[in-house]
Amino acid sequence: MKKKTKQAGPAAWLRENKWTCAVLAAALVLLIVGRLLAAPARVEADQPEERADYESAVVEQVLSDSTEKDPAADNGYRGEQLLLVTVKSGDYQGQQMQVYNYVGPLYGGPLHAGDRATILISSYSDGTVNATVYEFDRLIPLAIVVALFIAAAVIVGGRTGAKSLVALAVTLVCLFGVLLPALMKGANTLLMTFIVCAYVAVVSLTIVGGVQKKSVCAMLGAVAGTALALLFGLLAQALTRVDGLRIEDVEPLLQLRQTGTPIGLRGLLVGGIIISALGAVMDVTMGIASSLAEVHAANPQLSRRELFRSGMNIGRDMVGTMTNTLILAFLGSGFTLILYLYSLGLSFRQLMSSAYVSMEVVSGIASSVGVILSIPLTALITAAVFTREKQQS
């Protein structure tokens, strides 16, 4: 007579993962509350003399084209086009308009019939309407790129890859739905960024690994490593005398602040350091915690000191690659400006003393310090947690 196999249904899964479900439910409540608190207040504004709308449009015909290749711009196009477009969204949907497309190194490229573009429609109180091409509409190409990324993550990573995509979605919601609106309302930049990053670390590691000993150790290590990156960033910022007011593209934010938006600018540099360090810190802490969990399972007789030493040996192999990754990422993001500064023939002292290069160095090193110091912290926490029962007996 065959034994009846016990089928694992939803109820059994919930019992087995009750702590994971509880943490994620609490995280969802916190996310909703955070979004409600950070949401911008509705203000009744006076009717402006000029209204600007960015709408999608399709090019029907190129009416005139004076673009030509410019050798000075690496054979890029320069000039202007007059286009006939059909508006596909907004109040002017379905209407045809003649719009100018200004082409050059600092603008977009030439457009052709059938291309989709984002156009800027300026409406004035006297009834006048002007429209120009803002940019080539990249929504569909970007959607294809994102779809390929999702497919690669799921095919290669399987269920874990799918979980990581959910964690990424939560991260994006936290950044764009909570952090940025909160900063626009005047929240403390450093405190708010750290809280959101700590939340992202806990939720992401819970989604990927569930609530287990190793994932809890990784969470604690990630939060501690992020805090250390923050502290080192503040120290380096004070020593080098650079702050958020010298960051590239901060001028529009200064203008925004002058119009009454209470955004804090001085913490933006260190806030960016925290965000950039978070991903690498989570990778390292989860790698250390998972490795030590396997080591302990293979040899439960190891002492706390021996398990900690194993974690440090594993972590040392990660330091070089992770440090390179972070510093190269920062230098790569500002590569064009660094190339321009180098072309000026500046001495090494002049180059390193420039505010921009100093900020890139501070950002890369502070992030790397957070990653490096999270290794012994995570190894210490994991060794203590996994050998606690042995120490008590």
Go through each PLM region and give its residues.
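Structural detector for short beta-strands of small beta-barrel domains
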Residues: 50-79
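Hydrophobic alpha-helical transmembrane segments of membrane transport and translocation systems
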Residues: 329-331, 335-393
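Extended, hydrophilic extramembrane loops/domains of integral membrane proteins
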Residues: 103-140
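Loop-to-transmembrane-helix entry motif
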Residues: 17, 185, 189, 311-326, ...
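Pore-lining and gate-forming transmembrane alpha-helices of multi-pass membrane transport proteins
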Residues: 221-226, 258-259, 263-275, 321, ...
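Helical hairpin unit composed of two closely spaced alpha helices linked by a short loop
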Residues: 278-288, 292-338, 345
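Hydrophobic secretory-pathway targeting helix
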Residues: 1-52
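Transmembrane alpha-helical segments that form the functional core of multipass membrane systems
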Residues: 147-154, 159-255, 263-276
